[in-house]
Amino acid sequence: MSKLEKNDLIDWFVSGEKPREDWKIGTEHEKFVFHEDSFKRVGYFGKSGISELLNKLAEKNNWEKILENNNTIALRDHTGASISLEPGGQLELSGKPLENLHQTCKETGLHLKMMKDVMSELGLSMIGLGYDPKWSRSDQNWMPKGRYEIMKNYMPKVGNLGLDMMLRTCTIQVNLDYFSEQDMVHKFQISLALQSVATALFANSPFIEGQASGYLSSRAMVWTDTDSDRTGVPGIVFDPNFGYESWLNYILQVPMYFIYREGKYIDI
């Protein structure tokens, strides 16, 4: 394998540029899964666990299973969409690239119906909130993914609420195309400038462990004490000379969690 140079990474940003007529949007939609009889969050193993849920989803909908140490940790279909697993068993739809929000709405609706059809057989249900409203950190179940074990050990070293972020939060994210470096900068700056407004508009997590938390968005509060090396608003984004190279320089100075070699996550 040839040595990777800085310019190779900048070229990767350049390779993502697309003409306006080819622009797409991609949505990531997370939700908590719980047992209907007890409202407890669902663990990976055992009866009506996340493993059984993923395997049934794959069988009934002809999705391909993605395995790690013989455990099903994600699914994907022929369109480019996937269902992945967050640290505490939150399920995430990573939608395929689509042309508009109407298509995204349809995709999400079909996904939720697919989920409900299988969950009803297992006595499970789901809810889309920014923060688990009922259960404590110690009540959560860790999913059997190698990189989460590394992050689990790292998070307490850099913040007080990183494990809560991993186990007790959900979100909806959007991925956008860009046609040039300047277009990327423009979209990046606007999205960061509007982040607080978006948080206020869609705040829906006022409870922690069954009590009012004092926040309309407990999820947003958690991110203030997670890992300052990779959270918050990077001031560099609003620099007059901000672009691919300066963003890359910022990324390269962020401490790494791990590297991935020959199918394994290696703690560094």
Each language-model region and where it sits:
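Terminal catalytic/cofactor-binding subdomain
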Residues: 1-159, 168
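Loop-rich catalytic cores of soluble enzymes, especially ATP-dependent carboxylate-amine ligases
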Residues: 131-268
